Amino acid sequence: MKYRFPKGMRPSTLRERESFYRYEFSLDRVEKWLGWRDIGNTAFAVIIGRHSDIYLPEYEDIKRKAVIIDEHKGLADVLDYILQYLPEGVYYDRNVYSDIKLCVERGCDYKNCWGCENFLGQELAFDIDPENVSCPYHGSIEDKMKRGEGLSFCMLEFKKVRKLTLSLYDELRAEYKKLRVVFSGRGFHIHVFDRKALKMSREERVELAKAYSHYAIDEWVTNGEMRLIRLPYSLNGLVSRICSPLSIEELPAFDPRNHSIPSFLLSSPRRSSRASSSRP
């Protein structure tokens, strides 16, 4: 499958993925992002090659699946899994559990957590992707899907979702105080860390997703159906861009052609500690 992206954006090779995670990926920054929750009780996941079709041959049978990492001793352990799989994407589970070991012992599929006594809530998030908006050149999401270009986008579409993200942020901050914006590699995520958002019921989330559907969000993220979200500071291997938290002041001028570019596209990566980033 061929994708259409803005200039300079392309799938990363296996060697480039390995280079990024060995020398540039910052465990310190990930730990800070997840600092509000118990990392030991957090599940992670990798998608090996679902969209890029670039993967280690031994993982062909699972290249399209989300491989859940729920038995780990911390972020260094998670990084070992990442280096094993060299995935196109890395994610974390927004669900908050009292004891994730109980989920593992019971063989939970994580799809029916809402009524479980071990489930404490879910981090609220909004996922605004450029393919969700209509484009005078490339059509609607339905048109793109028919052509097999569901994840493709142009700068016109990107600028539309950038504007929508700003508008959605402005509307959300009237209700919530702890908001963070993240460039996902293609579009944007808005994370809500207010406790009242964490405790929202599934029914409340469904209504909320419907209320904000005009912002080109993926409703299944906001309504709680999809619990995984891309891990900040990881590599979006489909477009070779770093998933990057942004201040709201940075958002209006953010351009994926010039920002969040990994070192392997700029120059030879500089060797650094596994727990430190070589980027400033």
Swiss-Prot record:
Annotated GO MF terms: DNA-directed RNA polymerase activity
Alphabetized Pfam families for the sequence:
DNA_primase_S (PF01896)
The entry's protein name is Uncharacterized DNA primase small subunit-like protein AF_2298
Protein family (similarity comment): Belongs to the eukaryotic-type primase small subunit family.
Database matches in PANTHER family: DNA PRIMASE SMALL SUBUNIT
Q: Which domain of life is it from?
A: Archaea
- Any single GO BP term: DNA replication, synthesis of primer
